[in-house]
Amino acid sequence: MGMKESMEISSLTPAMKQYAEVKALHKDCIVLFRMGDFYEIFFEDAVTASKILDITLTSRNKGKEDSIPLCGFPYHASSTYIPKLIEKGFKVAVCEQIEDPKLAKGVVRREVVRIVTPGLVVDTANLHAKENNFLAAVFPLEHHIGLAFLDISTGEFRVSDFQDIRFFETELAALDFREIMVPQGSGKQGFLKAFAGRENSCRLDEFPDEYFDRESALGRLQDYIRKEDLEDLGLKDCPAVIGAAGAVLRYVEETQKSRLTHINRLQWYSAAEYLVLDETAKRNLELFKTIQDNRTAGSLFSVLDETVTAMGGRRLRWWLNYPLVDPEKIKARLAAVAEIRENHLFRENLRKVLSEVYDMERLAGRIALGVANGRDLIALKQSLKNLPVLKNLLADSNSFMLDRIQDGIDELPDLYDLIEKAICDSPPVTLREGGIIKEGYDEERDRLFFMTRDGRRWIAALEEKERKRTGISSLKVGFNNVFGYYIEISKANSALAPEDYVRKQTLVNAERYINQELKEYEATVLNAETRCREREYDLFMQVRECAAAEITRMQATATLLADLDALASLAEVAEKYNYCCPVVDLEDRIEIDVGRHPVVERMSLRDGFVPNDVVLDTDENRFLVITGPNMAGKSTYIRQVALIVLMAQMGSFVPSSRARIGVVDRIFTRIGAADSLIRGQSTFMVEMNEVAQILCHATGRSLVILDEVGRGTSTFDGLSIAWAVAEYLHDKNWIGARTLFATHYHQLTELAVAGTGYRNYNIAVKEWGDRIIFLRKIVPGGTNRSYGIQVARIAGVPEEVIVRAREILDNLEKGEMDEVGMPRIARSRKRKPRNPGQLNLFMSERERVIEELAALNISRVEPHDALNMMLNWQERLKEG
């Protein structure tokens, strides 16, 4: 509670004492304390929350020494405010009133009913529909690291074991966890500290060792997962995994205050089953977010995602995160995609029916968590209604995956019939206001409902009868929550009130009465309304419990529908963008004809996208050196090769006319210069870190794409490093990986002379006088020209600078140097000042630029650095 407030507990009111007790048990949470129709927040929590939620901070006992900081919001707005606290990494304890205040003797009893944390969000309105929200536990033990992670909204629960910390770090980055549990002391380890410091809003908490205790963890696992399934996973010899999984389950039970039936399946996954993509590769290839603005639009996922269900979107994201390495599994996906693609009407109908299916995975989770309302059950019913149609559509399918899906879909007719009979088609959101159960489902509910309805009719009849009896035409019978039913007569007519009328309330212009007849019927009607609402609530809970009993069946079908939607999405994309079905095998050859970049080709390019071929193997075409000017398309080309390989291994068709992909185990990238100045790393250090990761982990089955290695340091250092890296990757005694190496060091083309397996390619350029046109075509052979000056002209560098640069370049190519290596022309050329009368003291910016250019030793400047200088000069010339 942080009571600087150092207020003695004894001095607090009973309600605040109750709050203090709750806060003492949940010190790491912001406590939402239910008081009537509001959640109130006190003390330091209030100060923190008011800033995050942008709500007024006030105080109890304002102006007094014992004032208590206070803020709050209406309970019905919790779905708006709680996510804001969670987004900032806080945990929130929701403390509810658990008895009717009218019946309470003394202070109302309250209890924490759930704890919401970044990794344990159950409100689907506050989750990204097509992304998982994972809570993870990490348990380092001896030479193993156990990892377990759970999405509580779907029940997806996975585990893995790592003996190599670098593979483990790759997994941490891959899954973008929202919250990580570690044993006390483990948070000090470098790998977790580094991870927690990344910009991924991940909460990292240390827990007592008892959470990871093997025996209690195993017992807890056996409570959730069938014994046979646990034995099949072979967890007996994986104590680190058992400890991590048990910690997750204990934390879930403590925060949700119950055992959750939708957590009933544990899945083991191994990095060996998938193409490994580290954080750098995913960023550089822009799989899920663009580098420039961190948006989904413009990423590979945005191109491939034509899913029509949330669960299909999550499945597609998983496939993209974890491409396969088993050709048979890849071929099974490709065959299903091909079958859906081939039949336009089938594909259209399939996607139309799927679009009417709700997120059954998260609906099952809400039912298991006890938070599903009437609308959730109607969404489930609507989804179940479409299952027979889907089964019928898939009845004649030929591919293994579609056949398996068709066989496995459980229509759950019994559950559909129950919801259809019991729940109104348009139920209210809340469960206690009535109107949720259909007429005819329950006799007792109907009796109470009709009594309520008929009672209202009786009231109308009473009003008419009393008007006639009293002769007061303005008499009316009404109702309010405070006084109940009443007979209202205006002040002018109050003298006409019969003797059996008992005054109930006096208003400015009227008197309100009740008589014995109205009093008796009031008790009957009001009691019937209350009992009817209570009966409907009880009936709904029974229906929801029946649905909860079928959670496993729901989840099994939802899993199949997610697969089906992801397959249909890939088929839709393949047809829409004219992709081909790749041949995938275990050979070493990668051969792509007329390949395109799947994202770049979708952009509005004036001249259209220029496709290119590639041949890679582990022999004569092992290492491709690609030279050419900046902006010509080297980076796009090497990226597109990596993306096509990745797409093929996830089971997608690919943007080419023909493709044969020999499976790769990892894709490594070194593209661009992403500074990490926040972490104290220079551009060159980032580059060398990424290169080191590649050289330490690449194998002969890896695909490596490198762009401009060595450019972050001096020319000779950079060239030396680039050359040595190329040799190391090429040499089979070291790595021998299939590699595309884009570089501005044209000297590297000489590698092809030094050994076999190297191939030189360059980007074709058409020269037109002093100008160039990028043809974007990859052609055999190297080039020793960078066209830096022409690129500078395209970039808009002033013509005077371009002309002067051309003069200096001509001089350099003639080798006209003085004894200290400075071009004579650069030092001695006389310039015409633009303003002859201006003194040097007031030299113009344009003249300063030309002066700097004249003094430049161009022999020591590479084209890439020259371009940066020219861009700087251009900015200064524009400003000056």
From Swiss-Prot:
Biological classification of the source: Bacteria, Pseudomonadati, Thermodesulfobacteriota, Syntrophia, Syntrophales
HAMAP family hit by this protein: MutS
Keyword DNA damage assigned: yes
A Pfam family of this chain: MutS_IV
Similarity comment: Belongs to the DNA mismatch repair MutS family.
Record organism: Syntrophus aciditrophicus (strain SB)
Protein name per Swiss-Prot or TrEMBL: DNA mismatch repair protein MutS
GO molecular function, one term: ATP binding
Record: residues binding ATP: G628, P629, N630, M631, A632, G633, K634, S635
Matches recorded under NCBIfam families: mutS1 (TIGR01070), PRK05399.1 (NF003810)
Family matches, as InterPro entries: DNA_mismatch_repair_MutS, DNA_mismatch_repair_MutS-lik_N, DNA_mismatch_repair_MutS/MSH, DNA_mismatch_repair_MutS_C, DNA_mismatch_repair_MutS_clamp, DNA_mismatch_repair_MutS_core, DNA_mismatch_repair_MutS_N, DNA_mismatch_repair_MutS_sf
An example Gene Ontology CC term for this record: cytosol
GO biological process, one term: mismatch repair
Function recorded in the entry: This protein is involved in the repair of mismatches in DNA. It is possible that it carries out the mismatch recognition step. This protein has a weak ATPase activity.
The keyword DNA-binding is annotated on this UniProt entry: yes
Keywords, comma-separated and alphabetical: ATP-binding, DNA damage, DNA repair, DNA-binding, Nucleotide-binding
